[in-house]
Amino acid sequence: MKQIITHVTHYRYTAPVTYSIQTLRLTPRDDEHQRVLRWHIEAPGALEQQVDAYGNITHTLTLNRPHTEIELRVVGQVLVDPLAQGALGGEDSRLPVHAYCVQTALTQADDTILAFARAVLPDGLNTPADVLTLATAIHDRVAYEPGTTDVTTAAGQVLALGHGVCQDHAHLFLACVRGLGVPARYVSGYLYTTNEHAASHAWADVWLAGTGWTSVDVTNRQFASDCHCRLAVGRDYDSASPVRGVRTGGGEESMEVSVQVQTALQQ
């Protein structure tokens, strides 16, 4: 599928910011499953490109002049191939696979999470069918309800609350999978969809012996497909988020995000 993507993020501040630095993970990688045809980031300053420890393309934006707003505008086209049961295979990674067994503050598996995972998969997680079984169980346990959590909500809180959004589904899934001793990683990206879910999306990859990385969209109870454009991977939201930054000054901050994903047929 050829995806045409427009992503605008606008930050506004109630007082001047004297210095800010942001890390942008807003550029998809070329790999055997997706090809970037055209991509451009428009920002109010020079961008310094790097590749981080997870293999993500990042840009650093530094502003050392007073400002009361920042607008980041991304436009591009990506050709995404279909995946057979979400299989990505053994793609190259800067980190060893077992590095993705490490839990984080957002994905820590407490006793309740471990009991939930073991009840769903008493024989462990070994096959693509197991991946989908766990995704479905989480989907059924945690209702999709925007505005009830934020990016600091940890997996244990998500399970207790019983509602959340895509990053919450992904964090709980990662907690369960790593709790079962299987490597898994967080994925941020875009989703072409006609339903109520936002086009900015999050899902997860699981490492299966003999298969490699298998990608699953927990929120939609399905394997990732050519509707999913990958931006970044990490251990959790914090290491794969589209934008992370710090600033001096600025007072209160507000943010508006607009994401549109179309197919070539819609143009």
Regions found by a protein language model. Name each.
Residues 80-82, 93-164, 172, 237, ...:
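Secondary-structure boundary elements
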Residues 25-27, 42-44, 75, 205, ...:
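Residues in well-ordered beta-strands of folded domains
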Residues 1-84:
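Intrinsically disordered, low-complexity N-terminal segments that are enriched in acidic
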Residues 21, 168-251:
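Hydrophobic/aromatic-rich core segments of domains that either
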Residues 9, 149, 219:
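Ser/Thr-centric signal marking residues that sit
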Residues 19, 26, 43, 56, ...:
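Generic structural "secondary-structure junction" signal
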Residues 47-50, 98, 223-230:
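Short, surface-exposed linear segments at secondary-structure transitions and domain or protein termini
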Residues 84-91, 216, 243:
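Short, charged, solvent-exposed linker or helix-capping segments at domain edges/interfaces
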